[in-house]
Swiss-Prot record:
This is UDP-2,3-diacylglucosamine hydrolase. Keywords: Cell inner membrane, Cell membrane, Hydrolase, Lipid A biosynthesis, Lipid biosynthesis, Lipid metabolism, Manganese, Membrane, Metal-binding. It is an enzyme of class 3 (hydrolase). Mn(2+) 2 binds at D41, N79, H114, H195. Its main location: membrane. The gene is lpxH. Binds 2 Mn(2+) ions per subunit in a binuclear metal center. Coiled coil: none annotated.
Length: 242
């Protein structure tokens, strides 16, 4: 019995090697799991559920096959795929999670999230996030022709790359006090998230001497990064792209 967690694959037609590894993972590993959690940034950028491309259908097909074979799949939106919506969920069978979700892992209560909201020192990003998550703005964006949305997204991606070059690694990492605050909010001793691309298992001792665990998922840029969680053990492993 085990549950799988992945995040930050940044799937794109530009990186067929990552796509191939993802498909292999879905068909050979995810199919054997009790459940699969995708904690954001599955896509390098998801323009909208109306994406007509062969690439988008290819990815949706993998999820559809997995869920139709009885493996529950849960999806947390990241900062690159926050436009994943109900249509995507209906077409794939995945269950969309809120930004912060409490789950039961073999008797262990845990909070799962993408992780971007933990980076409270990155105020410019959080301001941007607040704007693009406004429902009216997302509805307006959804009404635009797909080709125009592609152009706007390319501009946004360029701005994001430029902005990251001027930020320190500390600003783009989580704020420890925010991590503790979220864990206290949900009364949990385990947190699992992605976003920072710094895979690790951290032990945290709080002021009341409670020992908590924060598991950070890795990205898939150079190799597949997967967390296998069972009742006895949490194991990170990486696999080279085929």
């Amino acid at each position: 019995m085990h549950t799988l967690f992945i995040s930050d694959l940044h799937l794109s037609p530009k990186h067929p090697d990552i796509t191939a590894s993802f498909i292999q993972f879905m068909r050979e590993e995810a199919i054997k799991a009790d459940a699969l959690y995708v904690l954001g940034d599955l896509f390098d950028f998801w323009i909208g559920d109306d994406d007509p491309t062969t690439f988008a259908e290819q990815i949706k097909s993998e999820f559809r096959q997995l869920t139709q074979q009885g493996v529950p799949c849960y999806f947390t939106k990241g900062n690159r795929d926050f436009l994943v919506g109900k249509r995507f969920a209906q077409q794939t069978g995945v269950q969309l999670l809120p930004d912060e979700a409490v789950i039961d892992l073999y008797g262990q209560k845990a909070v799962v999230l993408h992780g971007d909201t933990l980076c409270t020192q990155d105020t410019r990003y959080l301001e941007f996030r607040a704007k693009v998550h406004q429902p009216w703005l997302q509805r307006l964006f959804g009404l635009l022709p797909f080709a125009l949305k592609q152009k706007l997204v390319r501009k946004i991606q360029s701005d994001i790359r430029d902005d990251k070059q001027h930020k320190s690694m500390m600003i783009m990492d989580v704020t420890p006090s925010e991590v503790i605050a979220v864990m206290h909010r949900y009364n949990v001793d385990l947190m699992i998230h992605g976003h920072t691309h710094r895979p690790a298992i951290h032990s945290i001792q709080t002021d009341d001497q409670t020992l908590k665990t924060r598991i950070v998922l890795g990205d898939w840029y150079s190799q597949s990064s997967i967390l296998v969680y069972s009742k006895q053990l949490a194991t990170h492993y990486c696999r080279d792209h085929s």
